């Protein structure tokens, strides 16, 4: 219905321009909003206020002129001017009720649009280092990315979901040496675990697997491991220097193949666990992209060479630098260190070169908020490589903070003291976790209230929405139990009987669903859908409590059941996009 109003206003503008009452070269975006108060109609526009300055006329005068030339339309009952020049539209009941017929006809397809026009979009998200289980902070990025992908698909985009596996960096070496040291401990060596090693129980479990499969072939005396190494942090040394030294010692003692054995076993075990965890969370990736593959297929060299060819690099103190400041970054960035090793930034350059090389029209990176420093450098690299910077969106997601018993739970992967995503799912369920994670804007801090997530009350939004769906299903079951009839055709022919305020409100709400999807997609804000579904559920509960739904008057009863089924379908469609189930009973 909003599209009808926008069309009528556009025609009114053309009429005024053709009559010479308005400049012909106006470039005005027509915005139509849902009326917040039913007394002000169904839709409202501030078009007259927007036109006031360029037309040099009072908003109210412009509103009167617009209303006078708006074409008549059978769906519009009346148009009123309010306040300083707002134009309010009141729709006929017949126009509102047409949406019910559309929903019942389209079913699961209702709300899907063509905003994206099949543009290819790559969304990269989660991409947590495969050095331990996913924690509750990662869960928010997972839920947000998956839901955004669903929203964009519903809006007509061709979406690919990708996880970037950081399998070639220093953190993986730290995990590998952590596993090896626990392996030595199982062999009876009196190891002292490094301050900067990974300490979780999963490290012991991987070490146990290595011990069971490999026996003692990789055992070396502890004295040979730590001989002549610098001091660790507890002894007054630097933990970063110490862990790098012990990695180098492990590589020397085990050899390339031996160290790779621990590296690959740890990587596979942790990555398989991450995949299983996300699968159980309803988050499914189309692609798992290996950082190591960038080295193996020459992408790192290609990305660096592309910057060289464009004159965006220089050498200083034996290192190769990217002229990032030429593109707005605060400082230039190292691509290749003086020792010949490429940096993480070089991998980022190559990865984004690869993304565009695969033909995506739009790239969306979803990072944790702690990666805010990466945003500018990634965008400068994309621009320097000759790609359209506006085709790259970087969305920062604040980590969720979990509270239990009023106390904040601290999380650190290396210390091993963290609450995993799996533990959260087991405690509150997938549905609550998926909804709570996307109920706020991604940049907003989130305090995850476990008690609220588990409560069966109207204060718990996901329970409230699911209960609305279950209530409708219950009404349909009662229909059969009471031997009453629902003639859908009769209901559709008598939708004009739906005149109660609760009914017109519900009809207006379900009519908004396609607009919510398009808006959420355009702004990359899935929380709009979460808010909307709660509003729709509230409308349904109010209706359920105020009206006798299974009334004796057959025509009215059938019309109301058509409305109920439409609401149920919209709830079902919206919950599916959020990754939340729609139970038929609760």
Curated annotation (Swiss-Prot):
The protein's location, in the record's own words, is: Cytoplasm
Question: Cellular component per GO?
Answer: cytoplasm
**GO MF, any single term:** ATP binding
Q: Which CDD domains match?
A: ArgRS_core
Per UniProt, the keywords (alphabetical) are: Aminoacyl-tRNA synthetase, ATP-binding, Cytoplasm, Ligase, Nucleotide-binding, Protein biosynthesis
Q: Which catalytic reaction applies to this protein?
A: tRNA(Arg) + L-arginine + ATP = L-arginyl-tRNA(Arg) + AMP + diphosphate
Subunit structure, interactors included:
Monomer.
Return the PANTHER family for the record.
ARGININE--TRNA LIGASE, CYTOPLASMIC, ARGINYL-TRNA SYNTHETASE
Q: Which family does it belong to?
A: Belongs to the class-I aminoacyl-tRNA synthetase family.
- Write down what this protein is called: Arginine--tRNA ligase
Q: Which organism is it from?
A: Legionella pneumophila (strain Corby)
The taxonomy runs: Bacteria, Pseudomonadati, Pseudomonadota, Gammaproteobacteria, Legionellales
């Amino acid at each position: 219905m909003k599209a009808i109003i926008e069309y009528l206003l556009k025609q009114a503008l053309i009429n005024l321009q053709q009559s010479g009452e308005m400049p012909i070269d106006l470039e005005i975006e027509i915005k139509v909003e849902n009326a917040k108060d039913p007394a002000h109609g169904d839709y409202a526009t501030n078009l007259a206020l927007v036109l006031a300055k360029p037309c040099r006329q009072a908003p109210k005068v412009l509103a009167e002129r617009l209303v006078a030339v708006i074409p008549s339309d059978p769906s519009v009952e009346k148009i009123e001017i309010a306040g300083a020049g707002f134009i309010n539209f009141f729709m006929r009941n017949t126009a509102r009720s047409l949406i019910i017929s559309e929903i019942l006809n389209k079913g699961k397809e209702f709300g899907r649009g063509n905003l994206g026009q099949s543009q290819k979009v790559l969304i990269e998200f989660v991409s947590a280092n495969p050095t331990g289980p996913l924690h509750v902070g990662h869960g928010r990025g997972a839920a947000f990315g998956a839901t955004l992908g669903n929203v964009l698909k519903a809006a007509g985009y061709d979406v690919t979901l990708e996880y970037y596996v950081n399998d070639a960096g220093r953190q993986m070496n730290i995990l590998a040496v952590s596993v090896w040291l626990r392996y030595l401990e199982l062999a009876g060596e009196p190891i002292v675990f490094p301050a900067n090693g990974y300490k979780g129980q999963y490290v012991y479990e991987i070490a146990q697997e290595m011990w069971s499969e490999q026996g003692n072939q990789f055992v070396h005396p502890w004295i040979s491991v730590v001989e002549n190494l610098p001091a660790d942090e507890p002894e007054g040394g630097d933990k970063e220097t110490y862990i790098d030294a012990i990695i180098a010692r492990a590589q020397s003692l085990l050899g390339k193949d031996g160290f790779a054995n621990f590296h690959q076993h740890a990587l596979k075990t942790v990555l398989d666990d991450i995949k299983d965890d996300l699968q159980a969370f309803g988050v499914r990736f189309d692609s798992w992209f290996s950082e190591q593959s960038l080295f193996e297929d020459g992408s790192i060299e290609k990305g660096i060479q592309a910057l060289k060819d464009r004159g965006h690099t220089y050498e200083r103190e034996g290192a190769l630098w990217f002229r990032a400041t030429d593109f707005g970054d605060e400082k230039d960035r190292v691509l290749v260190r003086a020792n010949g090793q490429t940096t993480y930034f070089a991998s980022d350059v190559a990865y984004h070169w690869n993304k565009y090389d695969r033909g995506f029209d739009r790239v969306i990176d979803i990072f944790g908020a702690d990666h805010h420093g990466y945003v500018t450098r990634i965008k400068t690299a994309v621009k320097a490589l000759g790609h359209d910077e506006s085709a790259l969106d970087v969305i920062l997601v604040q980590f969720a903070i979990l509270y239990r018993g009023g106390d904040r739970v601290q999380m650190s992967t290396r210390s091993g003291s963290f609450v995993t995503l799996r533990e959260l799912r087991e405690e509150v369920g997938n549905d609550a976790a998926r909804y709570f994670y996307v109920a706020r804007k991604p940049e907003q801090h989130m305090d995850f209230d476990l008690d609220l997530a588990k409560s069966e009350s109207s204060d718990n939004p996901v329970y409230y929405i699911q209960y609305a769906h279950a209530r409708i299903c219950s009404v349909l079951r009662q229909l059969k139990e009471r031997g009453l009839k629902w003639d859908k055709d009769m209901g559709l022919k008598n939708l004009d009987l739906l005149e109660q305020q609760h009914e017109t409100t519900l009809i207006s709400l379900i009519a908004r669903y396609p607009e919510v999807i398009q808006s959420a997609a355009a702004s990359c804000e899935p929380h709009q859908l979460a808010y909307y579904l709660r509003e729709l559920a509230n409308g349904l509960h109010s209706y359920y409590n105020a009206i006798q739904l299974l009334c004796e008057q057959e025509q009215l009863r059938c019309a109301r059941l058509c409305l109920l089924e439409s609401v149920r379908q919209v709830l079902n469609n919206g919950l599916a996009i959020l990754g939340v189930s729609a139970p038929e009973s609760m």
